[in-house]
Design a protein with these regions (language model features):
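Signature of multi-pass transmembrane helix bundles
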Residues: 1, 100-241
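Alpha-helical support elements that line or immediately flank enzyme active sites
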Residues: 18-34
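Short, Gly/Pro- and small/polar-rich lid/capping loops
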Residues: 1-19, 23, 97-101
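Solvent-exposed alpha-helices and their adjacent loops that cap or buttress functional pockets
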Residues: 13, 32-35, 61-62, 110-114, ...
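C-terminal catalytic/substrate-binding lobe primarily of soluble NAD(P)-dependent oxidoreductases
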Residues: 10, 86-102, 192-195
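Hydrophobic alpha-helical scaffolding
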Residues: 11-14, 55, 59, 82-86, ...
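A structural-propensity feature for long, helix-poor, extended segments
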Residues: 36-80, 93-105
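A short glycine/serine-rich beta->alpha loop
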Residues: 6-15, 49-60, 240-241
Length: 241
């Protein structure tokens, strides 16, 4: 169970699909070595569905795949992985907007047998860099520059992928209950304390700011501040933000 928690509770700056796009774009920019003058994005259907209308963090409320890619290129730090755009200055935010206005970013739907699939190709003149992420958000499986493969990791089929991860057959109500009752909290304290901090922070931001449909704030103002409603409101506010 501890290994499952470690695999699942990975910090990300915002909704993970657009952040994965930003990560791929930042990595391709790093490999290319210069600012690209055109970008091609090939993504699976699930990426399109989950990113199309989502606000990209630290961009001044820009939405969608193009914004995520531009943010990664202009302001991304690939070594931070899912916190790739956690630090974006006002100057960089302006540069992201300018980049979106001046550089063509094309999007193509592709299905290569993986539900989660992102390929970013960035070009400058005759040079190009290409990065592919597949199966999960930080899984860079191929890096290519000007026809030379710099890194490649064969993608596993779904059965092999599951075998490589912590055993999920434990995820039934009885075993989960037994773990909750008998676990040594020292094994999970750091993970859960971090999760509490992050979840509280995003919930408070959702209540204070103007995000999405503002469901969290509506619940509080309409139904009051009792414990039950406050729990619902904070969960909704975290989702809003």
């Amino acid at each position: 169970y501890v290994e499952i928690l470690k695999e699942e509770l990975i910090p990300a700056m915002g909704c993970t699909e657009p952040i994965a796009l930003a990560y791929a774009a930042a990595k391709a920019r790093e490999v290319l070595g210069v600012l690209p003058d055109s970008v091609q994005l090939q993504v699976s259907g699930s990426i399109i569905k989950n990113v199309k209308s989502v606000i990209v963090p630290n961009t001044g409320h820009l939405k969608g795949m193009e914004a995520a890619v531009a943010a990664g290129i202009i302001a991304g730090s690939a070594e931070k992985e899912l916190e790739v755009i956690s630090e974006v200055s006002e100057e960089k935010k302006s540069a992201i907007r300018d980049y979106l206005q001046t550089v063509p970013i094309t999007i193509e739907h592709t299905e290569q047998g993986h539900v989660f699939d992102i390929v970013v190709t960035e070009r400058c003149g005759q040079d190009y860099a290409r990065v592919r992420i597949a199966d999960y958000h930080t899984n860079i499986c191929r890096i290519e520059k000007n026809g030379t493969v710099l890194y490649e990791m064969p993608l596993l089929d779904e059965t092999v992928q599951e075998d490589a991860r912590a055993d999920r057959s434990l995820l039934n109500m009885q075993d989960i209950w037994d773990f909750a009752e008998t676990a040594d909290l020292r094994d999970v304290a750091d993970l859960l304390e971090r999760q509490i901090r992050y979840n509280n922070a995003i919930a408070e931001e959702g209540l204070l700011g103007d995000y999405g449909a503002n469901i969290g704030r509506v619940l509080l103002t309409t139904y009051g501040n009792d414990v039950s409603n406050r729990a619902k409101a904070k969960a909704a506010a975290g989702s809003d933000a």
